Structures are given as structure tokens and as C-alpha cells.
Amino acid sequence: MSDITMYAAINSKVKAMQRKFLTKEQYKKIIECENYKEVLNFLNNETEYGKLLKGYDLQEIHRGQLEYILMKNYMQNFQKVIHFFNGEYKKFFKTMFMRFQLEDVRYILRGKYTGRQNNDLSSLVTYDSPLNDLNFEKMLATNNINEAIHALEGTNYYKYLKSITDKSDEETLFRIEVTLDFMYYSYLQKSIDKLNKKDKDIMNEIVGTYIDLLNLQFIYRGKKYYKLSPEEILNYTLTGGLNIKIDKLKKLCYSNDISKFQKVLLDTKYGKFVKYSVNEDYLVERDILSYISGMHLKNKKEHKSDISTVVAYLELALIEIKNITSLIEIKRYSINDEDLYKYLSFSID
């Protein structure tokens, strides 16, 4: 089967799904809303999201519940996308699904650390997916992080997490987080190798960029919040980055402070976009999402009969959810409309 034939149907479906994205004009109207409830009413009455909110009491929906509703819809759309593929391509997208599954694992483990009684499956976005193969009920029934990790015995997750110390603190959670990311990208890179050459090259570039940006986050957080040694931080960085190779990684890890870290970063492709020494953390996250968004929009425009359109849709849909939930959250506070623009991961003309 040619690439044109393979992608004709799925790209047509994806383009139809993309038309449901919010327009810049709709974003402007959300920003102009007076409060959280007004935003919900606008989403319900003036956008495609109204179909998702049907049947819910808008007066009772909080930010977390809205994010859950949006993510459950995303997972359904993800399943629709996978339906178009078979063989190694279906395996590839199933590996991508692991990214959301491990978020649910993280949610449970963090709950065990904080003492939150998160024993409700309805808080998890992947538990009822046909792609899910984890026993979340068993994890939720445990009393602490150590027991929850042992509840994963027999799964790929357990192989990576079993050596994590039973010490329950923020640093342990950080180690769990980076270990899960290492696991995910290890499996993802293996599945990419099974794609055809064109798609393999595209995905290696995309994933290599993600690894670069994730490594920057690891290094920054390890230095600022956990005071980890350069050796420890370097040990947790991921291999396979596109633009930041081992020599540059070492310089970043061994930089003495955030200012020197940023100076080394300026000598990379990302330095002028990601500014840790200047911006607050939420602005850095916004800039990273903006960079990712621009990459996918460019790929979608330049590549037609390949994997770019599908992956761009899946990633841009996630960014839209982040934009919506960010705006919803800050509508609780009295922030000028002009200031709200800086929370979005793209520019509004």
C-alpha cells in the first residue's frame, strides 16, 4: 500500500476533527469573559465543546472536572485515530497511548504520597480504554507508594519502578516521574524504528525535540527544586535528543546556577525561545508548548502523505486542552484581559 493510499482516509478524518478546534476569535471571546462560569457558558453555547458539556450542570463543574471531560473526549478521538492503522503502525500508536496511561499511574502514586483518598476510577482518563492493560483497582486499593508500585508487578512499569526507594518524599516523586518518562521514550523509540523510512525520520525529529525539551525541564527542576548533584541529574537525562547531545547536556548539568544554565542554553537551538533565568515557570511551559505547536503546524503544512498530519492533530488537541484549562483556572483571579494572552501557547493577532 502506498503512503498516499494509507493516509488518504485518516488525513481526511483528522482534518474534519481539526475543524472543531477553537478559532482565535473564540479564544478572544473567552478572554473577554468576566468569570469562570461565563467561560463555561460560552464553551457550552458557542463552541463544539457544547456537545461534551450536554447533560452536565454548568454551575457544578470545576476546573479539574472540565479537564477530565476534555481528556476523556481526547482519548475517544485517539481511539478513532488508531482504528485506521494496523500492524506496526497500530503498535506505534498504542505505545503513544502509554504516555497517558503513565499520567494515571503518576496521579495514583502522588495521591499515595499526599494521603489523598484517590480511590475513584472516574478520576483516571485511561482506565476504561480498550487500550488499557493495567489493573488500576489494585493500585488504588494500596496504602502507600511502595505498595502501589508492587501492585504493578508483572507489567513493564514494575520493571522500571521496582528499584525506586520506599522513601516517601518529593524527590522520590521526581525520580518516579523521570523513570516513567525514560520508560515511555525507550518504548516509543523502539516502535518508531518499525515505521517506514519517511515516517521514521519525521518521528525521530519530533521525539528528539521532545527529549531535548524534557531534558531541559529535568535539569532545571533537579537544580532548582531538588538540589540534585550534576552526576545525578545527568544520569536521569534521556538519550536520543535531536539538538542537545551529550557534551552540551553535561555542560547544562554541571552549570553552577540557573543564570549559567541559561547561558549554556543560549548556545542551543532552544535558547532564544526558552528563558529559565528570566521567566516564571508557567511562562517557560508556555514557551515550550508554543515551540512544539509551531513545529507541528510547520510539519503539517510541509508534509502531506505521511504521519505528520495525524501526529500534529493529536498534539495540537492536547495543547488546546491546556490552553482552555489554563484560562479557566486564571479566571478565578482578577487579571486584565491583556495579561491573559501570555498564558496561551500561541499568539493571537
Predicted regions and their residues:
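N-terminal domain-start signal
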Residues: M1-D349
